[in-house]
Amino acid sequence: MQEKIRETCLATKTVKLLSARRLIVKIGSAVVADAETGEIRGPWLETLIKDVVRFFARGQQVIIVTSGAVAAGSRHFKQLDRSLRIEEKQAAAAIGQIRLMIAYEQSLKRHGFGLGQVLLTSADVDNQRCRLNARSAFQQLLNVGAVPVINENDATATPEVCLGDNDRLAARVAQIAKADLLILLSDVDGLFTEDPHDNPLARMIPEVRRITPEIEIMASLSPARHGSGGMVTKLMAARIAMEAGCNVVIAKGSKSYPLAAIENGAPSTWFIPPARETATRGGR
């Protein structure tokens, strides 16, 4: 009986994935860049892009939100042997963003797609006119065969006004783009009852339909391993996206062909909103 229920749940989630008209795929720093060297993981990125191309081939649209600029540019500051100051992180982001986009562009080009870089700030996503302009830009890029690849403009953002992590940026992009599904690729399989690194008996939560105080406590027990975000920020992102009527998946992204893995039933946590359109859908 339990196996039958599991198969039914998997089939339902697969349908949601295959039927999503527009998807946002967020890629964490720990997934796209080597944690020690900051080098872009080119072979892995190629498998992700092959997944993205396959989605486009069956009539779906994909918008990418990527972290990794600071990681890719930080090797210029290795001699400091300490945590980077704000201005150093901004410089690292400016250097690394170019490397990051070149890697994406080269991989997309091999499959006949262009790339459209979009750098957003908190002011952009908080302003209705900017949101509408961004939505129009996303659509025009998709119309001409260019995949929007989005990052926060870390080179100019300050702690007072920055979004702070790309999980919430991805959720706001999902609002703006009227996406049906937000996929958060991370260094963990999903939401656990406790931190699985500390407690091997921790259980993964396969599905969340309402973010309760208990769910928030679970998220607080799952700290980030790398990057600026953790499970708490992913839960924040899930709440934002669910309020816009968008399904959310948290899954481990470090494996090759990470989107195909989700499609084939790899461990993940799905956040499923009520089956209705909400007033906030579209970020208006």
Swiss-Prot record:
Pathway entry: Amino-acid biosynthesis; L-proline biosynthesis; L-glutamate 5-semialdehyde from L-glutamate: step 1/2
Classification via CDD domains: AAK_G5K_ProB
MF (Gene Ontology): ATP binding; glutamate 5-kinase activity
Protein name per UniProt: Glutamate 5-kinase 2
Top class in the EC scheme: transferase
Keyword line: Amino-acid biosynthesis, ATP-binding, Cytoplasm, Kinase, Nucleotide-binding, Proline biosynthesis, Transferase
Superkingdom, natural source: Bacteria
Job description of the protein: Catalyzes the transfer of a phosphate group to glutamate to form L-glutamate 5-phosphate.
Any GO BP: L-proline biosynthetic process
EC numbers for this chain: 2.7.2.11
InterPro entries: AceGlu_kinase-like_sf (IPR036393), Asp/Glu/Uridylate_kinase (IPR001048), G5K_ProB (IPR041739), Glu/AcGlu_kinase (IPR001057), Glu_5kinase (IPR011529), Glu_5kinase/COase_Synthase (IPR005715), Glutamate_5-kinase_CS (IPR019797)
Organism: Mesorhizobium japonicum (strain LMG 29417 / CECT 9101 / MAFF 303099)
Substrates-to-products reaction catalysed: L-glutamate + ATP = L-glutamyl 5-phosphate + ADP
Residues involved in substrate binding: S67, D154, N166
Compartment(s): Cytoplasm
Cellular component annotations (GO), alphabetically ordered: cytosol
Keyword NAD among UniProt keywords: no
Binding site for ATP: K26, S186, D187, S228, G229, G230, M231, V232, T233, K234
Protein family: Belongs to the glutamate 5-kinase family.
